[in-house]
Amino acid sequence: MTLRMNDFAARIGLLLIILVAAVVGLRSQQSQGSAFLDFVSRRVEPASSKHTFGKFCPVDQSRFARKIFIEYGAMFVASSDVQLPTSCYFADEAALLKFQSTLKTSSTTLDGVEIRLQAPAMASFLKVLDAARQLNVSISPLDGSIAAARSYSDSVSIWNSRFQPALVFWASQRKIPQDDVDQMASMPLPKKVEKVIDWETGGLLFGTGRRRSIFSSTAPPGTSQHLSLIAFDIAGKVTPLITALFNANGWFQTVSGDPDHFTYLGVFEGELPKRGLKQI
């Protein structure tokens, strides 16, 4: 489903957008592109701010920025108690460390590993765990502590664990010229991601096992919601009951094709349409 934007969207050059989220186990999508964009604009650019939306996320100038905003931008409709970055991605480790140093965080131990989140997200997460225990439902972190907070190097490692094997495979199948492979090492991340967008559009998938898009398997370095400490990945099958427990406490599945991934938005389900999200 594609959505036409209003004048606001035209102003930033984004004419079509698909943004997915999940509510009560169903895929969710922007109900009104204008509602989503307008809300995000107000959320990240208050009246007193001198920053423009383009500085926050240059979707009109960069296919990289447009892609990550579409894939992971649902986090920017989070409640006001969630601290959000001033850019839709972190350009490097220094930028991420500066942001993370300003966060009020809290930790707990789950299955023997530390789970660290922004304090409001953790308070809600503990309610989810408590409700799950009362119902004898098991919730475990996927891949240890990186199920929650991540460092910049974590995001690089996870991306490369999908990207590099797929690149080698498609090159071996002569689907990607060796010259393109050689250029990858020195290519800036945004341009590298744009090449992946082109390859996947042509049917060369880079996700796990090359069965799905890499963008539903992992986010490019510096773009993951985990870097803002408001995401959690669940190991094992995500049942409707588990989804309902998370949804009831302000957590929703917001990344297309990644049902294990929950994002803390900190709002009730009924509030989501007002922020530009709806069930699909």
Predicted regions and their residues:
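Extracytoplasmic cell-surface/polysaccharide-interacting catalytic and binding patches
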Residues: 4-280
